[in-house]
A protein has these predicted regions:
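Catalytic cores of RNA-modifying enzymes
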Residues: 1-57, 62, 66, 71-76, ...
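C-terminal lobe and adjacent flexible extensions of AdoMet/dcAdoMet transferase-like proteins
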Residues: 272-321
């Protein structure tokens, strides 16, 4: 079956009595150009700087000051974020281990296998999981796991994959990304992540300080990854057609914060979570007696949050999720 043929995808669903589940985000990608864009973005070797950003410390005091002006964020304006942003043309060695969450009918899975990847695909729908095994049966380079990806992430099944490529389900996509990335510092998270998500989610992930759409997810992701919006994908490229458009997003580990200890990471999570829960408040009001600042959460860069986390020290660890 040609998985980029709308008529063939529809015929398979009809003949098998399969009805795409909106709750599970079963909107199947049926556009060859969009598919190739995802695969091309995924199989470019990341350019990782060997330099790392030291954890910034300030004098130990009960109240730490932050200016309203922020230093430039790694995932901000220096990275292309428009639909026509060119990707570097690079010949590279293909990664051997690739994680895919929510493969659906297997259009991405098939493309990854064709390009030489060894794929572990996690599919929640048992009908689609069985179909994937039958249609793309490749015991040497394809493993299909049935169940909830969040459970597999928590039990460590998803650790150790250098590459993750997924058309993430709309309702759970952000949570899946955060759960994967939060394992950095304790376990091995992917060096490169290429995902297809709602455009509004993509914009939040890539937003730099000062942006109205900057939020907790973007700050969390940018702590360890540079973010690039590769291109937009119209709703017409899916069947069934979703209500809104999507975007291909590429995340590459920058390793600048690798020397941030577990306490700093936990404090960072606690600070940012609490700050964005009260995003319209000035930080001085949210953290009375701890931080002196008239800035609001979205106005701080990741470097600012890192400096605060290192200066404040371990606290709030039980609440950082």
């Amino acid at each position: 079956m040609n998985l980029t043929s709308p008529s063939q995808v529809k015929d398979w669903c009809i003949s098998n009595g399969f009805h795409p589940n909106k709750v599970l985000g079963q909107n199947f990608l049926i556009d060859k150009n969009a598919l190739d864009s995802i695969l091309d973005a995924a199989l470019i070797a990341p350019s990782v700087s060997s330099s790392s950003l030291p954890v910034q410390q300030t004098e130990d005091s009960p109240c730490h000051s932050v200016s309203k002006s922020s230093v430039f964020c790694a995932a901000g304006d220096s990275l292309p974020s428009a639909a026509n942003s060119p990707l570097p043309s690079t010949n590279c060695q293909l990664p051997t281990k690739t994680l895919e969450i929510g493969p659906g009918l297997g259009v991405l899975t098939e493309g990854l296998l064709e390009r030489g990847c060894a794929v572990t695909a996690i599919e929640k729908d048992p009908v689609l999981a069985d179909r994937l095994k039958e249609s793309l049966g490749n015991p040497e380079r394809l493993a299909v796991l049935k169940g909830d990806a969040l459970d597999y992430i928590k039990d460590g099944t998803c650790d150790g994959f250098p590459l993750m490529v997924s058309n993430l389900p709309y309702q759970a996509g952000t949570r899946i990304l955060i759960e994967i990335i939060d394992r950095i510092g304790r376990f091995e998270a992917p060096e490169t992540i290429v995902v297809l998500v709602q455009t509004e989610v993509a914009e939040r992930l890539a937003a730099s300080e000062g942006s109205k759409v900057r939020g907790l997810a973007g700050v969390r992701v940018q702590f360890d990854y540079d973010v690039q919006i590769v291109r937009k994908v119209a709703a017409s490229c899916f069947w069934p057609r979703p209500e809104i458009g999507s975007s291909v997003v590429r995340l590459v580990r920058h390793h600048r914060n690798d020397n941030a200890g577990e306490d700093v990471r936990k404090t960072f999570k606690w600070l940012t979570k609490r700050a964005f829960e009260h995003r319209r408040k000035q930080l001085g009001s949210t953290f009375k007696g701890l931080i002196e600042s008239t800035a609001r959460a979205e106005e701080l860069s990741n470097d600012d949050w890192l400096a605060l986390s290192g200066a404040i020290g371990p606290m709030g660890k039980a609440d950082a999720t």
